[in-house]
Structure formats: C-alpha cells, structure tokens
C-alpha cells in the first residue's frame, strides 16, 4: 500500500526518529514561546500595513489585498499591459524579484502575484523598492 511504502521510506531515510534538539525546541516554544509569537505576529502585521501603504503610494496600477490570516499577500496586475509570462520575465529580469505567479494557482490567478512579507523590514523594503524602480522604468 502507499502508506506502507511511505513509512518504509521514512524509516530508511532516518526521519522516523525524533531529533532531541527539535523536541526540546518544540517543548520550549509551547511552554514559553507565547510572547515571542505575539511579537512576531505584531511585526508581520506591521509589514502588511507597510506593504499596503507602499503599493498605494508608489505602485498605483498594482492593487494589493490585505491577507486574511497569512503573511502571503496578493496583488492584482490586471492594469499592466503584460501577459503572465511577460510579467514574470519583467519581475525576474528588471525587478530581480522571484514572486509566486498567480497562474500557478489556476486560470483565476493569472493576473495576480503573491509576495511573502514575513521577513525583516529591510528585506521587504529592498524588494518593494526594486519593484518600484522596475515599475517606473517600464513607464507604468
């Protein structure tokens, strides 16, 4: 059966055994990690608001959506005169950004890109500024 083959492969690879450090880390996270998690969630919410504000001010043809329970944000590129393939090449070659193309989620996602904002603010700012420079250079 598929399950038996899966378990056999897990055992063969050594993943069936608990890692002592991982176990201690997990226990610590559950016992004393609450304040850290609260701070992390607050930080990510700050990044979300920062991204929403940045798009509104600097990238008016790209419409950013507030996420509902995640740190992955979607933005609508339907006002750009680019196919999904052209947009991906523009993002990679001009902005030097590798985002998640919405087309990987099906036809309804073709006009969207997805960005991860669970990172240091400096990293996020660097990426957003690269996107803005490519946006301006393209004349959008």
Please give the residue ranges for each predicted region.
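PLP-dependent class I/II
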Residues: 1-140
């Amino acid at each position: 059966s598929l399950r038996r083959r899966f378990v056999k492969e897990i055992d063969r690879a050594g993943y069936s055994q608990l890692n002592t450090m991982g176990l201690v880390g997990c226990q610590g996270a559950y016992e004393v990690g609450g304040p850290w998690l609260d701070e992390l969630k607050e930080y990510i919410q700050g990044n979300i608001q920062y991204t929403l504000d940045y798009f509104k001010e600097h990238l008016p043809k790209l419409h950013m959506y507030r996420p509902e329970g995640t740190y992955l944000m979607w933005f609508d590129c339907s006002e750009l005169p680019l196919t999904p393939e052209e947009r991906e090449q523009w993002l990679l070659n001009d902005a030097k950004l590798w985002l998640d193309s919405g087309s990987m989620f099906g036809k309804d996602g073709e006009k969207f890109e997805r960005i991860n904002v669970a990172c240091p603010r400096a990293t996020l700012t660097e990426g957003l500024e690269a996107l803005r420079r490519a946006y301006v250079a393209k004349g959008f």
